[in-house]
From Swiss-Prot:
The family this protein is said to belong to: Belongs to the bacterial ribosomal protein bL28 family.
Gene Ontology terms describing biological process: translation
Biased composition (Polar residues): 14-26
UniProt organism field: Bacillus licheniformis (strain ATCC 14580 / DSM 13 / JCM 2505 / CCUG 7422 / NBRC 12200 / NCIMB 9375 / NCTC 10341 / NRRL NRS-1264 / Gibson 46)
Protein name: Large ribosomal subunit protein bL28
One MF term in the entry's GO annotations: structural constituent of ribosome
NCBIfam families named in the record: L28 (TIGR00009)
Annotated Gene Ontology cellular component terms: ribonucleoprotein complex; ribosome
InterPro entries named in the record: Bacterial_rp_bL28 (IPR050096), Ribosomal_bL28 (IPR026569), Ribosomal_bL28/bL31-like_sf (IPR034704), Ribosomal_bL28_bact-type (IPR001383), Ribosomal_bL28_sf (IPR037147)
Organism phylogeny: Bacteria, Bacillati, Bacillota, Bacilli, Bacillales
Length: 62
């Protein structure tokens, strides 16, 4: 399973790391996703949820 929020769809993003000489090398920024137990179709399930979804109350832990 990919590290992607099942509620908001947040996932890692890619871009460039820039050195002092402005040389570019590829890098990724990981989304702040936590593995939590939530109710999915009335049953508890462990899924990845973003910290923003947890803070805003879009999902509740079981």
């Amino acid at each position: 399973m990919a590290r992607k929020c099942v509620i908001t769809g947040r996932k890692s993003r890619s871009g460039n790391s820039r050195s002092h000489a402005m040389n570019a090398s590829k890098r990724t920024w990981g989304a702040n996703v936590q593995k939590v137990r939530i109710l999915v179709n009335g049953k508890p399930k462990k899924v990845y949820v973003s910290a923003r979804a947890l803070k805003s109350g879009k999902v509740e832990r079981v």
